[in-house]
């Protein structure tokens, strides 16, 4: 069957009250859908994207050669089967792919927010999505699925909207961002802030799309290191040297160096640096226990079936961080959860690239 890819943007004029006490109004949310919603709306699956992801999770636009970021996972006969499920993925507020973010025009001034944009949290991102679903007359969904920052959103849904989803599937994530991950984000943030072409946030976005931003590229290289693992780097690159470079050339490169350069500099031409600063801030301050006496108290609110998936060699969100959630659920007597640690050498990116290692688990969770 057809993927039935549709893209929409909803405009909201009511204020969005943020966790910080700030207000965002008006605001837009861009989202994409796949499959067909059944009559009683019982087949809705929400997919939440990661830091640099977007609402475009699957399929191809007419002018595209590269499909959505989870195309191998969403579609006819795939783990999230669009022959069965109606899938919705929205771009989070604070991002740069259609939903309101720091480079959106501030009402009524018609100038980009830039630093006037309020800090948003993962909880705020989820709240905005919940408002979107109310607009769409969707008040309960079959499941919410997300990896990395998407997993953070899924877990926030479980705690703050406990009656919204039958099932929550969280992959490669954590209950609170730890110093190791915050440190990688700090390198990226400082690299952006100290690039003179960033112009203290008053850069020309069109110029950056052409030229990129070298500071952001360096920060992204650091990020890529945290997404991989020692094992995956060794397997992918070894000590291979670029065939066109001389071993004794000062700037001759190993293949791993070339990989980091390509991905780092290419990234800066399609992702906005202010959005990167705001979203990494949201990730850094993420903590499921905020507002509760403990993580256990927060998890007592969960009524959905909870499926936790970690990856053995994940450097960014270590597998024991997910195990801590499972352990707390055990302690409070929650019987409606499962935890698996997937053996993978791909590190954090395994949830994007090594789908065969866990897709059957997700299928079983959705269909069970």
Curated annotation (Swiss-Prot):
Pfam families: Abhydrolase_1
Pathway entry: Amino-acid biosynthesis; L-methionine biosynthesis via de novo pathway; O-acetyl-L-homoserine from L-homoserine: step 1/1
Disulfide-bonded cysteines: none
Subcellular location: Cytoplasm
GO molecular function: homoserine O-acetyltransferase activity
Record-listed E.C. numbers: 2.3.1.31
Gene3D superfamilies (UniProt xref): 1.10.1740.110, alpha/beta hydrolase (3.40.50.1820)
UniProt keyword list: Acyltransferase, Amino-acid biosynthesis, Cytoplasm, Methionine biosynthesis, Transferase
Binding site for substrate: 220, 349
AB hydrolase-1 domain segment(s): 43-354
Top-rank lineage group of the source organism: Bacteria
Main localization (coarse): cytoplasm
GO biological process: homoserine metabolic process; methionine biosynthetic process
GO cellular component, one term: cytoplasm
Catalytic function, reaction form: L-homoserine + acetyl-CoA = O-acetyl-L-homoserine + CoA
Subunit-level organization: Homodimer.
Stated family: Belongs to the AB hydrolase superfamily. MetX family.
HAMAP family found in the cross-reference section: MetX_acyltransf
Role of this protein: Transfers an acetyl group from acetyl-CoA to L-homoserine, forming acetyl-L-homoserine.
Record protein name field: Homoserine O-acetyltransferase
Underlying gene: metXA
């Amino acid at each position: 069957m057809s993927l039935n890819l549709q893209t929409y943007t909803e405009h909201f004029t009511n204020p969005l009250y943020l966790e910080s006490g700030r207000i965002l109004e008006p605001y837009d949310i861009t989202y994409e859908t796949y499959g067909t919603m059944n009559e009683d709306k019982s087949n809705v699956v929400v997919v939440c994207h990661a830091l640099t992801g977007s609402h475009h999770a699957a399929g191809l636009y007419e002018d595209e050669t590269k499909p959505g970021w989870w195309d191998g996972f969403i579609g006819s006969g795939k783990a999230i089967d669009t022959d069965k499920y109606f899938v919705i993925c929205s771009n989070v507020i604070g991002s740069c792919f259609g939903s309101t973010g720091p480079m959106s025009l501030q009402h009524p001034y018609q100038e980009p927010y830039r630093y006037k944009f309020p800090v948003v949290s993962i909880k705020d991102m989820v709240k905005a999505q919940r408002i979107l679903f109310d607009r769409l007359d969707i008040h309960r969904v079959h499941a919410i699925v997300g990896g990395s920052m998407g997993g953070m959103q899924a877990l926030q849904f479980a705690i703050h909207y406990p009656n919204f989803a039958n099932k929550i599937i969280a992959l490669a994530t954590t209950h609170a961002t730890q110093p190791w991950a915050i440190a990688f984000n700090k390198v990226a943030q400082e690299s952006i802030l100290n690039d003179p072409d960033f112009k203290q946030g008053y850069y020309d976005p069109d110029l950056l799309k052409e030229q990129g931003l070298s500071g952001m590229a360096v920060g992204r290289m650091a990020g890529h290191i945290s997404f991989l693992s020692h094992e995956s780097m060794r397997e992918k690159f070894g000590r291979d040297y670029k065939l066109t470079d001389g071993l004794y050339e000062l700037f001759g490169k190993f293949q791993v160096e070339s990989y980091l350069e390509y991905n780092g500099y290419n990234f800066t031409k399609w992702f906005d640096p202010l959005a990167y600063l705001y979203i990494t801030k949201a990730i850094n301050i993420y903590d499921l226990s905020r507002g509760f006496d403990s993580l256990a108290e927060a998890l007592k609110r969960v009524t959905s079936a909870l499926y936790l998936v970690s990856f053995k060699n994940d450097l960014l969100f270590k597998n024991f961080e997910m195990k801590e959630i499972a352990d707390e659920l055990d302690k409070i007597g929650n019987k409606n959860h499962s935890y698996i640690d997937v053996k993978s050498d791909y590190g954090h990116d395994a949830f994007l690239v090594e789908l065969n290692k866990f897709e059957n688990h997700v299928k079983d969770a959705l269909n069970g």
